[in-house]
UniProtKB/Swiss-Prot annotation:
SUPFAM superfamilies: Conserved domain common to transcription factors TFIIS, elongin A, CRSP70 (SSF47676), Elongation factor TFIIS domain 2 (SSF46942). Belongs to the TCEANC2 family. Gene3D superfamilies: Conserved domain common to transcription factors TFIIS, elongin A, CRSP70, Transcription elongation factor S-II, central domain. One of its GO terms (cellular component) is nucleus. The keyword Disulfide bond does not apply. The gene is Tceanc2. The modification N-acetylmethionine is found at residue 1. One of its GO terms (biological process) is DNA-templated transcription. Residues 39-113 form the TFIIS N-terminal domain. The lineage of its organism: Eukaryota, Metazoa, Chordata, Craniata, Vertebrata. This is Transcription elongation factor A N-terminal and central domain-containing protein 2. It is found in: Nucleus.
Length: 207
């Protein structure tokens, strides 16, 4: 009678965490407070400044800004501090209170770290050229000037949803937005009046 050796797989016990052992969480460079993506700062600024903006969007923008500590140079070049300061006088107590927190934290930080610049992340010239062209197409479809805040807000929201890349999805989304704005007057008016939030409008056309 033949004999067979049956090998059973060894069960490897997962290493147990030692009591008191520190658990490290991996962080991306953009999650650090001192790392400031200029594009994000400008996007949040347009969200704060756009007329008839919803409370939810204002709170969302302020909460994101609260996670960052921009340098004096960034505050000056983007004027984001001015936009946040204006929100301190908002009629909604939650928006005004959150804006006050952000403004106070930034002011305190700047006073303590005058000589320590933050790390700035900017787009390259080629990317900016593509985006300017997209803004031109959007402004024509909206029948607004190219430097209108609504045009800027729509383009920045599109760029953000496309992972801040000039890629296929970005180009297709811009084309879809332009087509709708040109050929569907009722949606164009809803976007211009604020009845249709920019975020919702862009999200429904993302390709």
């Amino acid at each position: 009678m033949d004999k067979f050796v049956i090998r059973t797989p060894r069960i490897q016990n997962s290493p147990k965490k030692k009591l008191g052992e520190k658990v490290y969480k991996q962080a991306t460079i953009e999650s650090l407070k001192r790392v400031v993506v200029i594009e994000d700062i400008k996007r949040w600024k347009t969200m704060l400044e756009l007329p008839d903006q919803t409370k939810e969007n204002l709170v969302a923008a302020l909460q994101e800004l609260k996670k960052k500590m921009p340098s004096r140079e960034v505050l000056r070049s983007t004027r984001i501090g001015h936009a946040v300061n204006k929100m301190r006088r908002h009629s909604d107590p939650e928006v005004a209170g959150l804006a006050k927190e952000v403004y106070t934290e930034w002011k305190t930080f700047i006073e303590k770290h005058l000589d320590r610049p933050s790390i700035e992340v900017r787009s390259d010239p080629k990317t900016e050229s593509f985006r300017k062209n997209a803004q031109k197409l959007l402004s024509e479809a909206l029948e607004l000037k190219m430097d209108h805040l609504l045009v800027e807000n729509i383009e920045r929201e599109t760029f953000h949803l496309c992972s801040r890349l000039i890629n296929g999805p970005y180009r297709r989304t811009v084309r879809a937005l332009v087509f709708t704005l040109k050929h569907r007057a009722e949606i164009r008016e809803q976007v211009k009046s604020g009845a249709l939030p920019v975020g919702t409008f862009v999200q429904t056309h993302k390709k």
